[in-house]
C-alpha cells in the first residue's frame, strides 16, 4: 500500500502557526545561547593562554567540567536541579516567565561556551608570539595587549571553527524539547501527534533546519573572506 502524502496539513489548522512559533523560539534560543557562549568562550579562551597560572587553571576547570558532560544532562540540571536551590521568590518568578526557556538558554551557553573556548584558544595560539611581545614593548599591560591586539586578531582567525560551533549550537537547541521548550522539533512532534502525519511534519522540520544552517554557513563564509588575515591560519586547540 502506497503512502499518500498530505502536505496541506502543514498549513491547515494550527500547524502553520506551530511551525512559525517553533522557528521563532529556535532562533531566539540559539541567538541568546550563542551570545552567552561567545562571551564565555572569549573570556575563558583568553584566560587559558595568559601567563598567570591561577587564571589558566580556573578557565581549564570550567572548560573540562562543562565540555565533558552531555548537553542533555545540563538541560536537566539547570531545569530540574537548580530551581529548588533558589529563593522561593526567584523560583516563582522564573516559572512565571518561562523557566524552561531560560534553563535551555543557559545550558546551551555554558556548554558551547566551553567548546568555543577551545576555538578561541586555538586562534590565540596561532598568533606569532612576537605580536604579544611587540605590544608589551610598546608599553601595554598584558590585559591591554590581549584586549587591543591579541583577542581581535584571534577572533578573525577563529571564524571558520567558530562557524562550525555556532551551527552545532543551532542544531543542539533541539535538545531543549526534553525540558518542554516549544522550539522547532517540539512543534513538529506536536504536529505529528495531532495529524498522524509524521513524514510531512518531520520533513518540514528538517527543511527548516537545513535552510537555517545553510543560510548561516553562507553568511559566515562571506564574513570569513572579509576578515581573513593573509598568512595566518587558525589551528585547533
Predicted feature locations:
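Transmembrane alpha-helices and adjacent helix-loop boundaries
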Residues: 1-237
Amino acid at each position: 500500500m502506497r503512502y499518500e502524502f498530505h502536505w496541506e496539513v502543514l498549513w491547515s489548522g494550527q500547524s502553520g502557526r506551530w511551525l512559525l512559533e517553533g522557528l521563532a523560539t529556535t532562533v531566539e534560543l540559539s541567538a541568546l545561547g550563542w551570545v552567552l557562549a561567545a562571551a564565555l568562550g572569549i573570556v575563558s579562551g583568553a584566560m587559558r593562554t595568559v601567563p598567570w597560572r591561577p587564571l589558566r587553571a580556573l578557565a581549564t576547570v570550567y572548560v573540562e567540567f562543562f565540555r565533558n558532560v552531555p548537553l542533555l544532562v545540563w538541560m536537566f540540571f539547570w531545569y530540574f536541579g537548580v530551581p529548588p536551590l533558589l529563593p522561593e521568590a526567584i523560583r516563582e518568578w522564573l516559572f512565571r516567565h518561562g523557566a524552561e526557556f531560560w534553563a535551555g538558554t543557559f545550558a546551551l551557553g555554558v556548554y558551547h561556551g566551553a567548546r568555543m573556548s577551545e576555538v578561541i584558544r586555538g586562534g590565540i595560539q596561532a598568533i606569532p608570539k612576537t605580536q604579544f611581545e611587540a605590544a608589551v614593548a610598546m608599553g601595554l599591560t598584558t590585559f591591554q595587549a590581549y584586549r587591543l591586539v591579541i583577542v581581535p586578531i584571534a577572533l578573525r582567525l577563529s571564524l571558520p571553527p567558530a562557524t562550525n560551533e555556532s551551527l552545532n549550537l543551532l542544531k543542539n537547541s533541539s535538545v531543549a524539547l526534553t525540558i518542554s521548550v516549544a522550539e522547532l522539533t517540539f512543534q513538529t512532534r506536536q504536529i505529528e501527534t495531532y495529524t498522524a502525519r509524521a513524514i510531512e511534519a518531520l520533513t518540514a522540520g528538517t527543511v527548516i533546519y537545513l535552510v537555517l544552517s545553510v543560510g548561516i554557513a553562507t553568511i559566515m563564509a562571506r564574513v570569513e573572506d572579509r576578515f581573513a588575515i593573509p598568512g595566518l591560519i587558525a589551528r585547533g586547540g
